[in-house]
A protein has these predicted regions:
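Short coil/loop "hinge" linkers that interrupt or connect long alpha-helical coiled-coils or helical hairpins
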Residues: 282-316, 450, 454-459
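Conserved ABC ATPase signature
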Residues: 34-39, 448, 452-475, 498-506
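Extreme N-terminal "head/tail" segments of very large remodeling/mechanoenzyme assemblies
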Residues: 1-79, 584
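Alpha-helical coiled-coil
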Residues: 102-143, 246-294
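Extended, charged coiled-coil helical stalks used as long, distance-spanning scaffolds
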Residues: 171, 175, 179-286, 307-423
Length: 584
């Protein structure tokens, strides 16, 4: 089975003219030191930051403004990634480098292909599209963050709330309940949803057009035979000419323009509302928040509130204001068109009325016909008939797409067979029960923990130290289930300081034993912990990175490492290039 493994991490701070590099071996790695404030957590956070995740750094580290390079492998293939702020430079051969201006979009797609991560999430907004989520959603089950994860699994990184309701599909994908085929079908469902929405918008426009026709030409109860109309037409055809056709065209054009104006006015209301909301966001960030972090009161996500972030808000506001201005200009153009069409329509109708006065008469059956009414009726019926046909067509399309969506959702449900679901459930409950027992966390009530989505039910029973061990049992179970499910290429398991809540000596020994004996043989493990005698069995098998009082960055070595990163940056080609090989 293929695995992703970290090889080398390089940190460079031009601010302090200091740098360092760290190498990892394929199986066990230990990051340790004599005390708790030497940078163990910052080191592992930078691994994930380099790959586009957003771990929570303290202000001291942020002030260093580091560039971070990471070398990693998937099976036998080497990859290099360099992150500077939010820009990613990437290579799959160590020679040709390609620069991505942002983490979302192309880079996320490239990375997801490398690790075979097929989960997709709908974007927020009125017109959601199915997107490849950033690498953070892939790495979530592989990183136990010291501050965020021991009491809240699936919460190792910031900014995860960029997608609504992401947890269920992501957790289920990692643990095998949703397959890559599920998301392939989901893409088709979203395509049909977009077609349904477009059809609905067309129906709304058609209804508006019909209302406009009825406004200009009220409904008539006039009934006239073809023979009667031919008699009248023959008498007046030289003078009536193309007036009926002209009125029909003018009326159709006017209804189209009025309908478009109506919908643009709705869009204008939305755009104005967006400007106001963005202005309120900026005022709040400036007037009420004193630091560079802002925690969401609803989901707990910590958002960036730095000067750069505030500048981004102002940029968003400018874009929204530009959109308001553009829509207003479009409406003004439509108003001009309406002002031009209305006199033309009135002129045509006035000419028809003149002909009506000239030829108003009764036929031999004493039936009296008003030519204006006849021409109006035929024009109105023609326009309404055309739009009604389109309306019926769009409604049929909407129903067809809804039916296809139902078929696809049924196909999705059938992907997870009863036996497969039972097998996944048995694997999960059996393993977490075994691990909780091995970790001596028997005070934790597992009776309601039947599924990987039940992680919150781990907490609340047993003591705080037992809760920490139960959290590790859960994370280890998920890690093993990822291998069992085989939906993706697994990443290394990174555990930041498992000695939470002052674990008793024998329980800490059990934690180390579980990590050594119950992680898959082909997996890579990176463990952070204070140096002590109980780490002995792990140290015997591990590559040890021992941090000293100089912490992560040193003055010596800066020139060499800085030059290495500069050469990569200078050689990188701007933008995504299809030359990147994703098939190896």
């Amino acid at each position: 089975m293929k695995n992703l493994k970290f090889k080398r991490l390089v940190l460079v701070s031009d601010t302090t003219k200091s740098a360092n590099q760290f190498k990892f071996q394929e199986r066990f790695n230990l990051i340790t030191g004599k005390n708790n404030s030497i940078g163990k957590s910052s080191l592992v956070k930078n691994i994930f930051w380099a790959l586009g995740c957003e771990p929570e750094f303290d202000e001291t580290w942020n002030s260093l403004d580091c560039k971070v390079l990471l070398e990693f492998t998937v099976d036998t293939k080497n990859y290099t990634v360099l992150r500077v702020h939010n820009s990613i430079t990437f290579s799959d051969d160590g020679e040709k480098f390609y620069k991505f201006g942002k983490i979302t979009g192309d880079f996320s797609k490239v990375f997801s292909e490398i690790v075979n991560f097929k989960a997709r999430l709908p974007s927020r907004g009125d017109d959601p599209v199915l997107e490849t989520p950033p690498p953070a959603y892939y790495f979530l089950p592989f990183y136990i963050d010291q501050l965020r994860s021991w009491t809240s699994p699936w919460n190792s990184f910031k900014n995860l709330a960029q997608y609504a309701r992401w947890k269920q599909p992501i957790v289920k994908y990692h643990t095998g309940y949703l397959s890559p085929e599920h998301f392939k079908i989901e893409e088709n469902i979203f395509e049909y949803e977009a077609e349904k929405k477009e059809a609905n918008e067309e129906v709304k426009k058609i209804n508006t057009a019909i209302e406009i026709v009825e406004k200009y030409i009220p409904k008539s109860n006039l009934a006239i035979t073809t023979e009667d109309f031919e008699v009248i037409t023959n008498e007046v055809k030289e003078e009536l000419g193309n007036l009926a056709e002209q009125q029909e065209i003018l009326l159709s054009n006017l209804s189209d323009v009025q309908s478009l104006k109506y919908h643009l006015e709705n869009q204008l209301e939305i755009a104005i509302r967006a400007v106001k909301e963005i202005e309120e966001d900026y005022q709040f960030s400036v007037e009420y928040i004193e630091n560079d972090d802002l925690e969401c009161p609803l989901c707990g996500t910590v958002h960036d509130n730095s000067l750069a972030s505030r500048a981004s808000i102002l940029s968003d506001k400018q874009q929204a204001e530009d959109q308001v201005l553009f829509i207003q200009q479009e409406i003004n153009t439509l108003d001009t068109t309406i002002d031009e069409l209305q006199p033309q329509l009135e002129k045509a109708r006035h000419r028809i009325a003149e002909i009506n006065n000239k030829y108003d008469k009764s036929n031999n059956n004493n039936k009296k016909y008003n030519l204006t009414e006849i021409v109006d009726s035929f024009a109105s019926q023609s326009v309404q008939r055309n739009v009604e046909e389109t309306k019926i067509e769009k409604q049929a399309l909407h129903k067809n797409r809804s039916d296809k969506q139902k078929e696809l959702k049924k196909e999705q449900r059938e992907l997870l067979t009863k036996d497969r679901k039972q097998g996944l459930g048995d694997f999960f409950t059996g393993l977490i029960t075994e691990f909780v027992g091995k970790l001596n966390a028997k005070g934790v009530n597992l009776s309601k923990v039947k599924h990987p989505m039940d992680y919150n039910k781990l907490f609340g029973s047993g003591g705080a130290a037992e809760g920490t061990r139960a959290a590790l049992a859960y994370q280890m179970t998920v890690f093993r289930q990822i291998y069992y499910s085989n939906n993706e290429i697994p990443a290394p398991l990174v555990i930041d300081t498992p000695n939470q809540q002052e674990q008793a000596i024998q329980n800490y020994e059990r934690i180390i034993e579980l990590i050594l004996e119950d992680t898959p043989n082909q997996s890579q493990v990176i463990l952070c912990g204070m140096d002590n005698q109980y780490l002995g069995p792990y140290k015997d098998k591990a590559n040890i990175i021992c941090l000293d009082e100089h912490k992560l960055l040193k003055k010596n070595g800066y020139d060499k490492l800085s030059n290495e990163l500069s050469l990569i940056t200078e050689s990188a080609k701007e933008g995504y290039n299809n030359a990147i090989n994703l098939d190896s």
